[in-house]
Amino acid sequence: MKVLALRRSVAQVYADTQVYTHDDTKDDYENAFLISNLTTHNILYLNYSIKTLEILNKSGIAAVEIQSLEELFTLIRCNFTYDYEDNIIYLHDYSYYTNNEIRTDQHWVTKTDIEEYLLPGWKLTYVGYNGSDTRGHYNFSFTCQNAATDDDLIIEYIYSEVLDFQNFMLKKIKERMTTSLPIARLSNRVFRDKLFPLLSKKRQRILNIGPRNESMFTFLNFPSIKQFSNGPYLVKDTIKLKQERWLGKRVSQFDIGQYKNMMNVITTVYYYYNLYQKKPTIYMVGSAPSYWIYDVKQYSDFTFETWDPFDTPYSSMHHKELFSEKDIAKLKDDSILYIDIRTDRGNIDWKEWRKIVEAQTVSNLKLAYQYLASGKSKVCCVKMTAMDLELPISAKLLHHPTTEIRSEFYLLLDIWDISNVKRFIPKGVLYSFINNVITENVFIQPPFKIKTFKNDYIVALYALSNDFNDRTDVINLINNQKQSLITVRINNTFKDEPKVGFKNIYDWTFLPTDFNTTDTIITSYDGCLGIFGLSISLASKPTGNNHLFILNGTDKYYKLDQFANHTGISRRSHQIRFSESATSYSGYIFRDLSNNNFNLIGTNIENSVSGHVYNALIYYRYNYSFDLKRWIYLHSIEKADIEGGKYYEHAPIELIYACKSAKEFASLQDDLTVLRYANEIERYINKVYSITYADDPNYFIGIKFRHIPYKYDVKVPHLTFGVLFISDSMIPDVVKIMKNMRNELFEMDVTTSYTYMLSDGVYVANVSGVLATYFKMYNLFYKSQITFGQSRMFIPHITLSFNNNRTVRIETTKLKINSIYLRKIRGDTVFDMSE
């Protein structure tokens, strides 16, 4: 959903668009709630309130002020992520395909021959970091840039088994045009760039679990963040390999040597961060042309000092000469060294050239050892070739993708490796490594052992659901870690599957009720965005690979109506009931009938079941941005921080009724997941509320009326307005509450319209118009620890006779209250009040 705010209406008609005019009779929160439950994707919001826009954005729903038709046209035709704090819109708009172009935000790609392999007549355009160079295309009242690129497809091609780039891109673009937008992946980069600067300002130590290459630029600015990944491939791990020969396989049609070098250096930087938690100076030997340095500098400020007879245009300091052993002394501490020296073969005989390469490899390794031995805080990455070698068993082997698989690999060394045990590695084993192993991640830090860290902030985005992690350990971590942002895969199956397939692995699935947490927000991706100053125009799909975002220790926890709130709670219900259902009242009717309340007159107005809880349960796949458990808990301890809106406080019994309805709904739909979820929420309600029932009552509150429009043979026909189980010493407390509610009780709009047999031998008249007041009184009694109401649903009625009689229907008739009293069952009246 996207909300586009206008001061005046527009003449154009847009598909999937609805107009909402601000209602001045309602406050900003109520307007935001009503907007969020509209069913179209685009909302044109007229006569808007700035506060309402703020509320929507904090809820994760993109809401933007529009000043021109051009702005409106741009935003209505595509999806976007909105930084509502800095007023920046990141479009996810692939309409540039109509210009016969693909886009990249990696400069090195533009220096390759990739355009020779594009679709006929197509070109490649560089658009800068997150599309920053496209800002000049939009002369808008807000900052706007198109963050959509084809880098994901280019990188996927590099790691694929496919060689034909043109056919690969054609297939992927067609897929992109025929499937839904992977909005979370597109906006995740914006989210990470917002998240980690905010966390770093507030937190001393941050642990980040499971980063992938998509994050490799983001973390360059955060050397102190401790990363956990899948660990490195060590020299000693080659013991598992069988010897092989030279393969000579082409990986990419266009030259990706630049990519390989960039990945090697970034891997080395993160390895250095893990050891020393600070930025190094980057020395590079055999550097030309290293166009990728431009990309790294777009994200983070590094000093590059380079040596090569050819130019290295983006180096901070370039020495246009060969590097020699005597230059080692010039290299300072707190640095990394990347050695990428190799003589071009030219016309040299391959046997002669092989001798040169092997000699160069030995020389390179000697340079690396000398560099590491000469100072402190150093890491080296050195180019190697497959040959018989003695190598430190703890050295790290790297083999990032390059244009052709030949005999080249890289060795990552630290100062401890050079003094470690060395092992003889045959050439055939190194060929086996080169032929079969691709380094898929620049993060090669050790794996995370699932345990809590008392003083650290843990971030684990899409990292802990895999079934090689123990599910109980993951739950315990979330329950006990004081400060964290952790995602787990939501159980949106219908058969309550404990795990589901994802690519070539399996993920555990989770529901919010799997966790026993306090001071925690459990929400969706869009709900989480709102907490960190972002909003999004397209919410997560109800099915597929979606995640719960779990925030421990957030200062937003008590701000119940601002973050992870109830906006959009009825949207799915509205979509169904106004399109597919038997009547738009289907939900109301079902909730009453499933609780044995058969008086459906005014069912859409006089509710006995919490619609919030009911919708949050049966449609949780659509509205899990609403943190239901937090909502229940904060109400139970009376610490819900409500800033505004039309606020109705539910009685705890209304929540129980909602669970009962949801369970019956789930049974009819054969939805085992909702069935379990509703059962667990009901248990949670009973846990946090101390609900007691007057199933064996000794007092009741009665209401007598001036006139009953039916024949009756009981002595005093009355409405039993609830029963109580109290000691005589509690009577003054009950009377006090009755007196405090005097005006509301006498002002009830009580009506009746028919009679019926409540049970065999009990003939009654229906009563409408009292439930809202009943539940308000229930709440007051509950807070005073007075047992009021029974476990079965309260069905308001007036007993007319204890004989069987036929049903009588009359015009709806108002009943005028004569008196309201408290009376002991089979005893005397102890309190009476008249109007």
From Swiss-Prot:
Residues 246-428 are annotated as: 2'-O-methyltransferase activity. Residues 693-835 are annotated as: 2'-5'-phosphodiesterase activity. It holds the Pfam family Rotavirus_VP3. Its EC number is 3.1.4.-, 2.7.7.50, 2.1.1.56. Residues 171-245, 429-555 are annotated as: N7-methyltransferase activity. Multifunctional enzyme involved in mRNA capping. Catalyzes the formation of the 5' cap structure on the viral plus-strand transcripts. Specifically binds to GTP and displays guanylyltransferase and methyltransferase activities. Has affinity for ssRNA but not for dsRNA. Capping activity is non-specific and caps RNAs that initiate with either a G or an A residue. Together with VP1 polymerase, forms a VP1-VP3 complex positioned near the channels situated at each of the five-fold vertices of the core. Contains a bipartite N7-methyltransferase domain, a 2'-O-methyltransferase domain and a GTase/RTPase domain. The C-terminus contains a phosphodiesterase domain that degrades the 5'-triphosphorylated, 2'-5' linked adenylate oligomers produced by the host cell in response to IFN stimulation. This is Protein VP3. It comes from Rotavirus A (strain RVA/Human/Japan/AU-1/1982/G3P3[9]). The lineage of its organism: Viruses, Riboviria, Orthornavirae, Duplornaviricota, Resentoviricetes.
